[in-house]
UniProtKB/Swiss-Prot annotation:
Gene Ontology annotations of biological process type: lipid A biosynthetic process
Family statement drawn from the similarity comment of this UniProt entry: Belongs to the transferase hexapeptide repeat family. LpxA subfamily.
CDD domains named among the record's database cross-references: LbH_UDP-GlcNAc_AT
Entry GO terms, CC: cytoplasm; membrane
Descriptive protein name: Acyl-[acyl-carrier-protein]--UDP-N-acetylglucosamine O-acyltransferase
Keyword hit for Oxidoreductase: no
Disulfide bridge map: none
Length: 265
């Protein structure tokens, strides 16, 4: 049964599934859809064309689905789509997209978004990510699955953060982080493979060793960028007998090959 506090303001056109809870003084706009089992704390605003899945938990004073902070925005009906089983803590802001992109900001499933995080217009966030307190990502940023964003880190618009990567606290990121890599610094630079994180997620020692070798080829062995891509592609072919390792090496290679903004150096 849906439970709405007497002081909450829920527009009659909003669509709330069963077992949704809306806390005191929260505001739910007319174009909002909220899935079953989602809980919204007190003093939280959910507005815009926002669709939220099931079993999410929004803490107090979050601002979800507000218009993009983009001076080109002219009130187009852009969207925010949030998946299932996400935690969004206090004072987080997540904005809808813009017509200059696909018009949709997306948050996947099972993400942990801590207090004071900002996720700007048109961002694409995958699954199982962690945004530590005060992490801020600008418009059009893509954050892939299993990424960890350190506290007070900042990401420039249009940057991509590859799967299983980690950005250290108080870092400033202006170029792409390849998958599986740790980056840190006020001009974020690479600091090796995220070995501990990969172990926790069940990567084999063989796969981790291969990724460390690919990192060495890219960053340590003196190859040019084009030469490094060729060498890593050879590693993919040589690992064909180990499907899991070949897949991860291929993902590493394909990411750096596709980067348009350039990777961290």
């Amino acid at each position: 049964m849906t439970r709405i506090h007497a002081s909450a303001v829920v527009d009659s056109k909003a669509e709330l599934a069963g077992d949704v809870e809306i806390g005191p003084y929260s505001v739910i706009g007319p174009n909002v859809k909220i899935g079953a089992g989602t809980k919204v704390g007190s003093h939280t605003v959910i507005e815009g064309y926002t669709t939220i899945g099931k079993e999410n938990n929004f803490a107090h004073f979050a601002a979800i689905g507000g218009p993009p902070q983009d001076m080109k925005y002219r009130g187009e009906p852009t969207q925010l789509i949030i998946g299932d089983h996400n935690t969004v803590r206090e004072f987080t802001t997540i904005h809808t997209g813009t017509s200059q992109d696909e018009g949709i900001t997306r948050i996947g499933n099972n993400n942990w978004i801590m207090a004071y995080v900002h996720i700007a217009h048109d961002c694409q966030v995958g699954n199982h990510t962690i945004f530590s307190s005060n992490a801020q990502i600008a418009g059009h940023v893509q954050v892939d699955d299993w990424v960890i964003m350190g506290g007070m880190s900042g990401v420039h618009q249009f940057v991509r953060v590859g799967q299983h990567a980690m950005l250290g606290g108080a870092s400033a990121l202006a170029q792409d982080i390849p998958p599986f890599v740790i980056a840190a610094g006020d001009k974020a630079s690479p600091h090796g493979i995220n070995v501990e994180g990969l172990k926790r997620r069940g990567f084999s020692s063989e796969t981790i060793s291969a990724l460390r070798q690919a990192y060495k080829v890219l960053y340590k062995d003196g190859f040019s960028f084009e030469e490094a891509k060729v060498e890593i592609q050879k590693m993919v072919a040589a690992s064909a007998a180990d499907a899991a390792t070949a897949e991860k090496l291929s993902q590493f290679h394909d990411f750096i090959a596709a980067s348009t903004r350039g990777i961290i150096r």
